């Protein structure tokens, strides 16, 4: 019988385990603080920021919400980030996507102090990750690693197919899983929109990670040998519901569940883990900046 990987439950346990690190910091006179900068008026971003704040409050991390008018200049955003960089009481900084079109994405990635870049996307931190000495593992890839570990899946020697090559999930996850380290040593194939015969790759995989942003692309016919299926996607599609839509992943859940040994649902799979790993990185950042050693799960 296929096992449903409950990301909500795993994330809840991780948050509980993180409270020890918070207590260690507090005992040393350090209140870990995460500042989130929001420069858009999208409801999805508002909801996500609110959920992050609730997570912070649950474990004892101070959450600071900084809002900037989407019509403001790009310099307004960068000046705000510079002020947060300079504050010793702020340990983690997150600029919530998306930012307005007039704000250069590459400049946003480079604006946050690498030591406070808890998303792990600053070029310096990307380089450290690729070099095998990550300061912060990007939240979603790290969350996927934690889910696999919770499931008892050791990537060492496994065939892993990552469908998607984004800088946020696909590429960093492939790098993490291939590294010569715990949670790595997998043989990783990255597939994407130009891959010929995608199913030929997914059918030979022990683990399939779907992170391509295409609703229900991966179905049961594309799986073989009872793989573990991790669905990173979350897509809003039209549906005959009260809201007029429903959320689906990049995996056709019903058919894939029948062909998999274990699978993550959408929602309630990877999403909660992404938020939990943001807390993890914030505590790691606070520890690094203050010199207070903490034990992280």
From Swiss-Prot:
Homodimer. Keywords: Amino-acid biosynthesis, Histidine biosynthesis, Hydrolase, Methionine biosynthesis, Multifunctional enzyme, NADP, One-carbon metabolism, Oxidoreductase, Purine biosynthesis. One of its GO terms (cellular component) is cytosol. It comes from the Archaea. One of its GO terms (biological process) is L-histidine biosynthetic process. Its EC number is 1.5.1.5, 3.5.4.9. Pathway: One-carbon metabolism; tetrahydrofolate interconversion. This is Bifunctional protein FolD. PANTHER family: C-1-TETRAHYDROFOLATE SYNTHASE, CYTOPLASMIC, C-1-TETRAHYDROFOLATE SYNTHASE, CYTOPLASMIC-RELATED. Catalyzes the oxidation of 5,10-methylenetetrahydrofolate to 5,10-methenyltetrahydrofolate and then the hydrolysis of 5,10-methenyltetrahydrofolate to 10-formyltetrahydrofolate. GO terms for molecular function: methenyltetrahydrofolate cyclohydrolase activity; methylenetetrahydrofolate dehydrogenase (NADP+) activity. It catalyses: (6R)-5,10-methylene-5,6,7,8-tetrahydrofolate + NADP(+) = (6R)-5,10-methenyltetrahydrofolate + NADPH; (6R)-5,10-methenyltetrahydrofolate + H2O = (6R)-10-formyltetrahydrofolate + H(+). Belongs to the tetrahydrofolate dehydrogenase/cyclohydrolase family. NADP(+) binds at residues 164-166, 193, 234. Pfam families: THF_DHG_CYH, THF_DHG_CYH_C. The keyword Amino-acid biosynthesis applies.
